[in-house]
Amino acid sequence: MKKTIIAALVMLCCGWMTATAQIEMYGGAQKTEDFLSQSKQFGTKPDPNFWLFICIGQSNMEGAATPEEQDYAWNDPRFQVMAAVDFPANTGRHKGEARKKYQWYTAVPPLCRAHSGLTPADYFGRTLVENLPDSIRIGVIHVAIGGCKIEHLMKEYDPQTVTKEAGWFQNIMHEYEDLPYTRVMECALRASHQGVFKGILLHQGCSNSGDKRWPAMVNKVYKDILNDLHLEAKEVPIMAGEVVNADCGGVCAGMNPIIQTLPETIPTSMWISSAGLPCGPDHLHFSAEGYRGIGRRYAEAFMKYKGIEKKQQLVDVKVEKKAKKAKKK
């Protein structure tokens, strides 16, 4: 069933027929990979200077902190977000025009949904723009669901099981038609005709806290994304951020040692430290300052992986001081 849906998405992106007709006509007749391969001949030629990143995860990727004025002040069109859901104008934390699903917009927060907040992706993208040549543009595809397990992001996830979840969780999942992986593909297939994928950002773990199977499950999600988009792992690394650190009283900090083992399972992965980054009063989510800091750390890790020389200090001085103080404890 999942292959049928994703195959239909490729047909839709190519403009051949409606999604409903695709599912009815092509139900399992072709492998997903065949359709993805065929789709490459359609659309515009990708711009090699438009660097694309997939951002997935749960509430810390979704963004819990309210953006502040300095965050809303961003207006550089070199950093863009493809809306993964429709945004009504001036709704929730979204201050501005309505956003339509699958369209690109200057990456002013919130990036995920109208009622979400500041995310690691915000300052990841801004930091890259500030450190890369003016010819390079950054685009993010952002799909995140507060409270989700890594299993909810898998290609094999059964949407019929969402009815067993809490009502608030179901409401978020419904915005992605209960299939987050499929929504990632819907966006990514469109974007693949416009730019080139350079990496995947993951921030997830609280809902799988203590589960030593987590690295293997992340690897499954990673491999499926690479295979379905015909990407090479060495060209598209995955970066996984730690949850709120023990030095800030993080209630899920016990997951961080498991996150740190991800490179043992995925050689083209990196884990991003959360040491010293401030959090909110729930000790589950970062504060706005914490999101800025971890976003910069994602960017620094990516630039180091790609051998890109940074032009400036990437982490706030006061955040860095907190990290050093924490290490002395």
Describe each PLM feature range.
Residues M1-I23, A326-K327:
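Bacterial Sec-dependent N-terminal signal peptides
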